[in-house]
Structures are given as C-alpha cells and as structure tokens.
A protein has these predicted regions:
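Small-residue-rich hydrophobic transmembrane alpha-helices
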Residues: 47-107, 144-163, 263, 276-340, ...
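Structural signal for membrane-spanning alpha-helices in multi-pass inner-membrane proteins
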Residues: 109, 152, 178, 182, ...
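Short alpha-helical transmembrane segments in multi-pass integral membrane proteins
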Residues: 1-21, 75-140, 188-246, 302-367, ...
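Transmembrane alpha-helix boundary and packing residues in multipass membrane permease domains
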Residues: 21, 25, 36-37, 73, ...
Length: 451
C-alpha cells in the first residue's frame, strides 16, 4: 500500500510540473504560429520576410535560452540540498548573463544582419521586411531573456502553473497586437510583416513586467530577494552558470540549426517539396512539445532529488518519466500513422503536396519515437548536472551522422528529399542509444558511491 501511495505521489508531482510546462511551450509555439499566419494574410512578401527573420532568430533564441535555463539544475540541486539562501545569487547571475547575451545579440545584429540578408539574395521587399522584423523583435530581446532567468527560478520551485498563466495571458495579447500592427487597426500604423515583430517585442516586455511583479511581490519568492539585494559579480558563480548553461545552449542550438540547414538542402527540390517539408516539420514540432515538457520537468525533479542525495528516488522519477513519455509517444505514433492524409489536409488542399506530406509524416513517426527516449533522458542527465554528455550526443547525432548521411543518401543513393528525414531518424536513434547507456552508467555510479 505504501508503495502504491509513493507511486501516486511521484505521479502527481511529475504531472503537476509537466502539464503546465506543456501548456506553456504550446502557447509559445502558438505565438510563432500567429506571427506566420497573420503575416501571410497581409501578403506573400510579408510572410516570406517574417519567415526568413524567424528562421534566423530561432536558433539564437533556442541556444541563448538553453544557456540561461542552465540555472534550473543548479537551483534544483540547491533546493534539494536545503541551501535556499544561495538560490538568489544564482538567479541574479543568470539575469546578468541574460543582459550580457542580449547586448551581444543586438550588437551582432547591428553589425552583420544586413550583410547576412544580402548574401541570401532576397527580393528587396523581402530583405527589408526580414531586416525590420528582426529590428522590431530586438526591442524585446533583453526583457525576454531576463524573463527566462526568472522562469528558471519559478519553474524549479515547482510553480510551473504561474509561468503557464503568464504565457496564456500573453497569447491573446500577442494576437491582438499582431492584428493592430500588421493590418493597421485601432489607430495603429499598418506595418505588414514588420508589425508581427513589433507585437512580439511588446509582448516580451509585458511578460517580463509580470514576471518581475510576481518575483517581487509573491511570498513564495520574497525570500530570494532577487531585486532587493545588490548584485555583486562572483566569478565562481558565473563560471558555474556557464559550465552548466553553455553545453545545454550549444546542444539546443545544434538541434535547432540542423533543421534550418536541412531546409536549405531540401530547397533544391522545388516549391511543392518545400511546402510539404515545412508542413510535416510543423506538425512534428507540435508533437515534440510532449517529450520537451517531460524533459524540462525531469530536469527539475531529478535535480531536486540528486541535490538531496536521494539517488534512488531520482532513478524512480527517471523511469516513470521515460515510461509515460514512451506510452504517449506510441499512442501518438499510431494516431499519426492512421491519420496522415487528414493531418496533411490541415496544411493544404493541393493533392500533390498532401501526397508528399503523407510520405514525410511516415518518417516523422520514427522521429517521434526516438525523441520519446532521447529528450527525457537529456532532461534527466541535466538534472544530474551531466550536461556535456547531451552536448556530445547532439553534436554527434546531428552533425556527424545526420548531415553527412543525408547528403550521401541524397547525392549518391538518390533517395530524394526523403534522404534528410531518413538521416534525421538514424541520427536521433544513435543519440537515444548513447544517452540511454550514459544514464544507466551514471545512475549505477551514483548508487555505488552512496553505498
């Protein structure tokens, strides 16, 4: 009976952390969808400009976000070890890094964005919209990354529901601002695709204001005195933040950027294939929100238990998270396989494109199943602060296996555009195997040390 109660308690803890994260990540994805779809209604040039800008911004956003979310396992360990007094210092240094990275990103944009867009040989109007869209988004870069720093605190303390509510509030605000600035409604100027960037920048400021108010006012966070204590740069603390955060950020950057590179290789196959690839990838990205949410939840839960030296409990959370995620992944895989034509019809009515999307979705099923193993284990290893393993795994899977293999299957074996989906599946399979072996080795090592 005690075992049943402990199991139920772990299950409740896991879902209470994971489900709000899932809703949060879906809300963030929905904002990107609003940017694209509403820009598309403004015109094809506007959609092209915001898409180019979004593709440049996404790897930067994901990579920098990863560096800052490196604070999560650090805070989780301190929480488990009952060293709450040190948590405020960790978050203040994360905010410092957020400001520093934001300044570098803005400076790099000022110096190199125009040159980069010129090398892409875009139409003049598309070039202008992409450039101004990025400039508008830059208005909110600093508050966005500072919000990520505060989210690391709030989520790790188990208050993922607060973050969820913030992003659910921001979602309709972002949609309304898009409507106003893209189409020139409610007295606002008609900016087309650039308006989507303005709306995004303003939304980032709104999110940040709410995060600051919550951390400053709510009793659950007052103890950490994030904005009350004066900031003193501690090189040792900064080094810890970077030693954990940079490998996470690089791993996430490599994962995000490989899809951009694959899109460039697929572009040679023509408009129909590009459209089909983007549709299949868009749906796959939506499915990825489930393993990503399990991954983030397991980083928190495993990190707290590892910090408290309760390694057996951390192992139980690991097994539970992987098993649940795999069960959901199998269910979704069956659902996708049996409904591929209907899923394709959500994106297009063109029968030729539908046929290609159906083909790509077949490979997406395997991608989803392998990710159901790899993503949660990435989160588990980060919970143990074993971040270099996930970095090496991502580098090997995507840049040593996936890209060269994709080129081989395309140029030598003549598999066509499917070559890159096949190589993504194989690369992710190797990643899942490596991460699984690493997790078993690490957990056995920690169990031996505890004896």
């Amino acid at each position: 009976m005690l075992v049943d109660e402990n199991f139920k308690q772990r299950l409740r803890r896991l879902f209470s952390v994971m489900i709000p994260i899932l809703i949060t990540q879906t809300a963030i994805m929905a904002m990107n969808f609003f940017d694209s779809s509403m820009s598309g209604h403004a015109g094809a040039v506007d959609l092209a400009g915001t898409s180019i800008g979004g593709n440049i911004w996404m790897p930067i956003f994901v990579g920098t976000n990863g560096v800052l979310l490196g604070a999560m396992p650090i805070v989780a360990h301190l929480l488990g070890a009952d060293k709450r007094d040190n948590i405020g210092k960790v978050i203040r240094h994360t905010i410092f890094l957020a400001i520093a990275f934001s300044a570098v990103i803005i400076l790099m944009g000022v110096l190199f964005l125009d040159t980069l867009l010129t090398h892409l040989h875009l139409e003049p109007q598309v070039h202008y919209i992409a450039k101004m869209y990025m400039a508008a988004v830059a208005i909110g870069v600093i508050p966005f990354f500072m919000s990520t720093s505060l989210r690391a605190l709030i989520d790790t303390l188990g208050h993922t529901g607060i973050t969820m509510k913030i992003y659910l509030l921001a979602l309709p605000v972002n949609a309304i601002l898009n409507y106003c600035f893209i189409f020139g409604k409610l007295g606002m100027p008609r900016l087309g695709g650039v308006g989507a960037g303005v709306a995004t920048g303003i939304t980032y400021w709104l999110e940040f204001a709410i995060f600051v108010w919550i951390v400053h006012k709510l009793p659950a966070f007052e103890h950490f005195r994030i904005f009350k204590d004066r900031f003193h740069l501690d090189i040792k603390q900064l080094r810890e933040n970077l030693s954990i955060g940079v490998p996470i950020g690089l791993a996430m950057f490599m994962e995000a950027s490989i899809f951009g590179v694959v899109a460039l290789f697929i572009a040679k196959f023509g408009t129909v294939i590009i459209a089909a690839h983007q549709a299949a990838l868009g749906f796959t990205s939506l499915l990825y929100m489930v393993p990503l949410s399990f991954s983030m939840a397991l980083t928190i839960l495993v990190g707290v238990e590892a910090g408290a030296k309760r390694f057996e409990e951390a192992q139980k959370f690991s097994r539970m998270g992987i098993a649940l995620n795999m069960a959901i992944a199998i269910f979704l895989a069956v659902l996708v396989y049996t409904n591929r034509p209907y899923i394709a019809m959500l994106y297009t009515t063109d029968p030729v494109i539908i046929e290609k999307v159906v083909g790509f979705l077949f490979y997406a099923i395997f991608f989803q199943l392998f990710d159901a193993t790899a993503a949660p284990i990435q989160g588990i290893l980060r919970g143990y602060k074993d971040v270099k393993a996930t970095f090496y795994s991502g580098f090997f899977a995507y840049w040593v296996v996936c890209l060269p293999l994709g080129c081989f299957l395309d140029f030598v074996m003549e598999h066509g555009p499917a070559a890159y989906w096949q190589s993504l599946d194989i690369g992710l399979f190797f990643s899942a195997v490596f991460l699984t072996l690493r997790m078993f080795w690490l957990q056995k090592k920690l169990a031996r040390e505890q004896i």
